[in-house]
């Protein structure tokens, strides 16, 4: 009974919203779709994945795999302006990833930069980086993506992997997340978006339909799968319906208000509900109230359309002290904790040297 009362107080605190900022000028939301080989958002007949004979979390003998649908690199820094995007790699074997990610173990953060199509090897990439991060105790994981789309079924699988392994997702300035990539946003615990996010209708490249009715029947199953996926991951099922209204040759860029309404930006609602109970127990009601207040201010003051991701992060870091963060009691659970990893490593090193002052992350 005490816990339910505590949660009720926390929910009531969240309902008191600060005044919304003045609306920004309406952006140009209509453009042409990428005419690449995947047509942006493709549905194909893919055999269900076989039950895995190897649990990659319990062995070093991973099945051979190579990244072919895009370019990936690993960085142990969130400051991409100063430090770039890290070390590139294509081999997804155990020891290859071990070598690339080992420097991130001490820092406690891994940023996976990916530029390319949404395909089956992207799912493998995310799954294996997450598995290696778990082995190394790296809790802060960022998928820094730039993708014009790919296969819907693979996007759903990759998004579910992300949801199970706690990723923050970035769409940086100059990057895009179009078509099937948009589904990945639902899988992130938190989404920081500066680049363009766009949707359009799914195309069945293996379709034998000769009428709109036949094509509609073929798309119905994948449309329902998209809705189920969006619902279980805290996004609005209206995203799937909206996609079907935009011709495949066109691209509808989502506005910040639409991203918010569809549950594709900021904190993931489903993950937030899941974490709230744990946070109240572990960090206390005051912590949860301060975190909620911070995120309301962050969304209004920092996450503005057109801002670069590094500027959004810098704004959030400057805002945190006003709400008592970082909180020494729950360093790994506070807002923008992924940006604290390097500062935390420095703090632990300082403590070993007899200086216990806690540095605050800055950019």
Label every model-predicted segment.
Residues 14-17:
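Bacterial signal peptide processing site
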Residues 19-20, 27-139, 148-150, 194-237, ...:
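Small-residue-centered hinge/linker elements
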Residues 151-154, 161-206:
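Glycine-rich beta-to-alpha active-site loop
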Residues 123-130, 155-159, 163, 181-182, ...:
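Extracytoplasmic/secreted envelope proteins and their assembly/folding machinery
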Residues 2-11:
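Bacterial N-terminal signal peptides
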Residues 206-293, 297, 301:
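Charged, glycine-interspersed solvent-exposed loop segments at helix/strand-loop junctions
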Residues 272-363:
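Low-complexity, Gly/Ser/Thr/Pro-rich intrinsically disordered linker/tail segments
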Residues 139-145, 170-174, 194-197, 236-246, ...:
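Surface-exposed patches in mature extracellular/periplasmic domains of secreted proteins
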């Amino acid at each position: 009974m005490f816990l339910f009362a505590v949660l009720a107080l926390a929910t009531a605190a969240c309902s008191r919203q600060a005044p919304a900022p003045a609306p920004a000028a309406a952006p140009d939301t209509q453009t042409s779709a990428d005419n690449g080989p995947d047509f942006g958002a493709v549905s194909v007949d893919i055999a269900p994945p076989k039950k895995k004979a190897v649990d990659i979390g319990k062995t070093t003998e991973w099945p051979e795999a190579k990244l072919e649908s895009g370019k990936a690199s690993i960085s142990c820094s969130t400051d991409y302006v100063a430090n770039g995007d890290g070390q590139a790699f294509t081999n997804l074997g155990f020891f290859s990833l071990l070598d690339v990610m080992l420097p991130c173990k001490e820092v406690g953060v891994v940023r996976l930069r990916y530029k390319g199509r949404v395909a089956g090897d992207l799912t493998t990439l995310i799954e294996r980086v997450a598995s290696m991060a778990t082995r190394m105790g790296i809790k802060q994981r960022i998928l820094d993506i730039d993708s014009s789309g790919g296969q819907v079924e693979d996007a759903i699988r990759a998004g579910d992997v992300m949801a199970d392994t706690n990723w923050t997702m970035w769409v940086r300035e100059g990057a895009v997340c179009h078509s099937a990539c948009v589904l990945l946003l639902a899988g992130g615990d938190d989404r920081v978006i500066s680049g363009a996010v766009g949707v359009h209708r799914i195309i069945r490249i293996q379709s034998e339909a000769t009428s709109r009715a036949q094509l509609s029947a073929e798309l119905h199953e994948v449309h329902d799968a998209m809705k189920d996926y969006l619902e279980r991951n805290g996004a609005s099922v209206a995203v799937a319906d909206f996609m079907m209204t935009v011709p495949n040759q066109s691209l509808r860029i989502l506005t910040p208000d639409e991203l918010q309404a569809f549950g594709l930006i900021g904190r993931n609602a489903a993950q937030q509900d899941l974490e709230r109970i744990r946070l109240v127990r572990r960090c206390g009601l005051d912590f949860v109230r301060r975190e909620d207040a911070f995120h309301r201010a962050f969304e209004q003051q920092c996450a503005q359309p057109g801002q670069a991701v590094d500027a959004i992060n810098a704004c959030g870091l400057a805002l945190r002290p006003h709400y008592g963060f970082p909180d020494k009691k729950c360093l790994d659970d506070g807002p923008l904790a992924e940006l604290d990893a390097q500062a935390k490593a420095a703090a632990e090193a300082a403590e070993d040297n007899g200086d216990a002052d806690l540095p605050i992350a800055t950019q």
